[in-house]
């Protein structure tokens, strides 16, 4: 089966079912006549921006959606995987990350400055990132975007 068709089937399954594990997804694919290895399925999941969301102590697969966010999908994945919390203070956003990931996010945000004039710069420590925004409103919007990514 061609990759594009397989990706469409995966989209349909994840959209219409609460999938808790890759094995469950793999089993539902097999029911539809799609045999896929775990490695291929993992690549497909990344390609489709499917993440594990948590709700009431349960983890399940869902699409990383941006809503009205101006944050690109690669950066959204960084936020989802590395950010612990975000809080705006005036025109600043203080982002707590997993240890060692603040500089990764800082570099990714710095790369966005050409397309996002609301981000002026970043300063990163080991687990904290300070984002300097053009205004308090811009900081509040960025914080809301990050929280939306984290909470869905």
From Swiss-Prot:
Gene Ontology annotations of biological process type: L-arginine biosynthetic process; protein complex oligomerization; regulation of arginine biosynthetic process
Pfam family, one: Arg_repressor
Entry's Gene Ontology cellular component terms: cytoplasm
Record flagged with keyword rRNA-binding: no
Localization per Swiss-Prot or TrEMBL: Cytoplasm
InterPro entries in the cross-refs: Arg_repress (IPR001669), Arg_repress_C (IPR020899), Arg_repress_C_sf (IPR036251), Arg_repress_DNA-bd (IPR020900), WH-like_DNA-bd_sf (IPR036388), WH_DNA-bd_sf (IPR036390)
Pathway: Amino-acid biosynthesis; L-arginine biosynthesis [regulation]
Source organism superkingdom: Bacteria
Gene3D superfamilies (alphabetical): 3.30.1360.40, Winged helix-like DNA-binding domain superfamily/Winged helix DNA-binding domain
Keyword Cytoplasm belongs to the record: yes
Function: Regulates arginine biosynthesis genes.
PANTHER family registered for this protein in UniProt: ARGININE REPRESSOR
Protein name: Arginine repressor
Lineage: Bacteria, Bacillati, Bacillota, Bacilli, Lactobacillales
Name of the gene: argR
């Amino acid at each position: 089966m061609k990759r594009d068709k397989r990706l469409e089937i995966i989209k349909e399954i994840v959209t219409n079912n609460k999938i808790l594990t890759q094995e469950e997804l793999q089993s539902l694919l097999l029911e539809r006549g799609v045999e896929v290895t775990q490695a291929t399925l993992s690549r497909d999941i990344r390609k489709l921006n499917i993440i594990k969301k948590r709700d009431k102590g349960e983890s399940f697969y869902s699409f990383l959606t941006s809503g009205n966010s101006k944050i690109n999908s690669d950066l959204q994945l960084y936020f989802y995987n590395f950010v612990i919390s975000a809080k705006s203070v005036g025109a600043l956003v203080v982002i707590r990350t997993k240890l060692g990931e603040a500089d990764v996010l800082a570099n990714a945000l710095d790369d966005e400055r050409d397309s996002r004039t609301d981000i002026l710069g970043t300063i990163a420590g080991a687990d904290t990132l300070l984002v300097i925004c053009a205004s308090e409103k811009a900081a509040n919007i960025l914080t809301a975007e990050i929280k939306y990514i984290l909470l869905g």
